[in-house]
């Protein structure tokens, strides 16, 4: 090992020099002040947790992105957080346990085993706001408006927002009656819009034809605002409850 190699950071791991650090700290304060003005309470989750707690309710992708290590005190497997969202959900459910809606925000470093792209970072600064205990259009709109104001504070221009309706997907999964493993596999194929793979899997699992047709249609329902009219027509058989 040369003297140069000794001081090289691992791939995807970055450090900020004074000018960059000062700029980022200014944005951090501005964003957290914004969240505070909206009634969001700051939490600081731990950087490391036991793996089973860290990955509760998460998918396989997060599992693969999580660094693991052994706790020298008891031999249990621990994980370095790759996403703070499950931690916020755990704090809301098991530490606070409020009946009224809870607004929480957070900012901290997360670590990924692999970068998103060929030259991407693995050590990222994540900021987020979560509204727990309220389901409906009002809470969706609040989070969306807060996100747009966050981007404005960070001076990010030319914003493009993709909107989806997760209730449609959940209802179709309920109709399909898939196992957890099958749901994860199908979700991965839907994310990649891999229609031939979706058709093959649904046929292999003997999913009812109406549900199969709608899951395939779901992979093609994207585009401008007129896609909503197509969705109402193609997914009409799902009934009420998703027509928001």
Regions found by a protein language model. Name each.
Residues 1-8, 173, 178, 185:
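Charged, compositionally biased N-terminal leader segments and the immediate start
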Residues 2, 13, 20-38, 49-52, ...:
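Positively charged, Gly/Ser-enriched RNA/tRNA-binding surfaces
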Residues 7-17:
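Generic N-terminal amphipathic, Lys/Arg-enriched alpha-helix
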Residues 46-78, 120, 124:
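Polyanion/phosphate-binding surface patch
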Residues 64-73, 177-203, 207-208:
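Acidic, His- and aromatic-enriched active-site or binding-groove loops in soluble protein domains
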Residues 76-78, 155-160:
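Short active-site oxyanion
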Residues 123-127, 163-171:
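Short, conserved phosphate-binding/catalytic loop or strand-edge motifs used
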């Amino acid at each position: 090992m040369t003297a140069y190699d000794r001081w090289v950071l691992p791939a995807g791991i970055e450090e900020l020099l004074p000018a960059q650090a000062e700029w980022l700290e200014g944005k951090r304060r501005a964003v957290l002040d914004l969240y505070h003005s909206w009634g969001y309470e700051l939490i600081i989750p731990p950087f490391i947790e036991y793996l089973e707690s860290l990955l509760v309710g998460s998918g396989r992708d997060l599992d693969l992105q999580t660094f693991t290590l052994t706790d020298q005190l008891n031999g249990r497997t621990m994980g370095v957080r790759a996403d703070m969202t499950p931690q916020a959900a755990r704090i809301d459910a098991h530490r606070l346990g409020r009946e009224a809606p809870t607004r929480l925000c957070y900012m901290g470093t997360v670590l990924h085993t692999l970068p998103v792209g060929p030259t991407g970072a693995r050590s990222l600064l994540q900021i987020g706001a979560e509204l727990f205990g309220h389901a409906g259009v009002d809470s969706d709109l609040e989070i969306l408006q807060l996100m747009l104001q966050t981007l404005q504070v960070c001076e990010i221009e030319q914003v493009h927002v993709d909107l989806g309706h997760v209730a449609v997907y959940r209802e179709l999964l309920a109709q399909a009656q898939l196992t957890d493993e099958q749901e994860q596999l199908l979700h991965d194929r839907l994310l990649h819009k891999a229609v031939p793979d979706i058709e093959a899997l649904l046929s292999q699992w003997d999913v009812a034809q109406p549900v199969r047709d709608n899951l395939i249609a779901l992979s093609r329902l994207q585009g401008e605002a007129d896609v909503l009219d197509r969705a109402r027509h193609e997914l009409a058989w799902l009934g009420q409850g998703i027509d928001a």
